[in-house]
Amino acid sequence: MTTQVVNVIGAGLAGSEAAYQIAKRGVQVRLYEMRPVRQTPAHHTDKFAELVCSNSLRANTLTNAVGVIKEEMRLMDSVIIRAADECSVPAGGALAVDRHEFAAKVTEYVKNHPNVTVVNEEITKIPEGPTVIATGPLTSPDLSAQLKELTGEDYFYFYDAAAPIVEKDSIDMNKVYLKSRYDKGEAAYLNCPMTEEEFDRFYEALIAAETVPLKEFEKEIFFEGCMPVEVMASRGRQTLVFGPMKPVGLEDPKTGKTPYAVVQLRQDDAAGTLYNIVGFQTHLKWGPQKEVLQLIPGLENAEIVRYGVMHRNTFINSPNLLRPTYQYKQRDDLFFAGQMTGVEGYVESAASGLLAGINAARLVKGEEPVVLPPVTAMGSMANYITATNAKNFQPMNANFGLFAPLEKKIKKKAERNEAYATRALETIRNFVNI
């Protein structure tokens, strides 16, 4: 066993995964987490891998790229996916979790590993020696300044928004119905149907509602996958009807007809007492937010247990700075992982931590860091953030468009996606024991 210690900074999804992967390979880890000594604007607990946006890790089937990346991670013994599987709540074809149980489980697995030492303090300078930086989109100002100095260039920044959560008991169940879109999987969503008149009233209130003012020096750049609902609405009346409020596949069983618009609620905890409003990330002020949400049929008297909030995200220009091993180009023993690398999403962040952790462990053991081929989901993400055009670099979710092309063209989308998935999983099995 090597006597070298790897520093991991940040115990979010990526940092927790990186620490676990390093530790299970017989290498000592010093895991730094500034919470609860210093909180972020979006976190509420001192637990590892706290989910601050949705409680969904998105699709869990192999017909979707994020489902493939999950399966790759299962094969690679991901602590994040193991905990998610153990803490899952009903969500149709998606993998959603009880966020409190999930964070507690990840904390338990990582903290109790004999090779992990947890240090609760804020890191303001990049340590010497093998280090994985996984401080996430809410990196503290002091460390951000250090990273800016290290990279020699400005960060990009944008905002992610968290959706409101309501108590199930406060929902008028006579006005909503249980159904998944196109009846896929189990009926896991509560649906609030709207007539055109109800939608118009809601829409006008939404676009007129007061938002939390942003600081003057901060430019608004929103990532499409977690865009505030009021920003979507500002793009035009139909944006919501074709976006988070699209009614297709959600016929009202009482009428047999498709509503004009539908607001979906997804179970947020294992007990089924809390539901989040799908796609309704927002930074409306709390008073106006409550007024707007109570215009949704079934939510007229909704008890909001968590209002939607807004927080800043930060990411580096990875194509200029990183190798596909997640190593910093100018320093072999410095790794980056998580959303700050430009991977977007819970699962993608954890996947980057998995690969960064494996490679940090390999480096200190005198082994070559591994580059996963872009025929795999994890390899395609690493390839995207390091090989795409640096000038227009933007965060990206896992998707089949990032995969290396198939040898033979397949016209039908379902068959093509199946071929991508089969090839990816066949390939990743060659890396299970790295």
UniProtKB/Swiss-Prot annotation:
Q: Which GO terms describe its biological process?
A: tRNA methylation; tRNA wobble uridine modification
Gene3D superfamilies noted in UniProt: FAD/NAD(P)-binding domain
User: Quick one: a GO cellular component term?
Assistant: cytosol
Q: Which residues bind FAD?
A: 10-15
Record's subcellular location: Cytoplasm
Q: Which GO terms describe its molecular function?
A: flavin adenine dinucleotide binding; tRNA (uracil(54)-C5)-methyltransferase activity, 5,10-methylenetetrahydrofolate-dependent
The record's listing under HAMAP family reads: TrmFO (MF_01037)
What task does this protein carry out? Catalyzes the folate-dependent formation of 5-methyl-uridine at position 54 (M-5-U54) in all tRNAs.
The record's similarity note reads:
Belongs to the MnmG family. TrmFO subfamily.
Tell me what this protein is called.
Methylenetetrahydrofolate--tRNA-(uracil-5-)-methyltransferase TrmFO
Organism in which the protein naturally occurs = Bacillus cereus (strain Q1)
Gene coding for it: trmFO
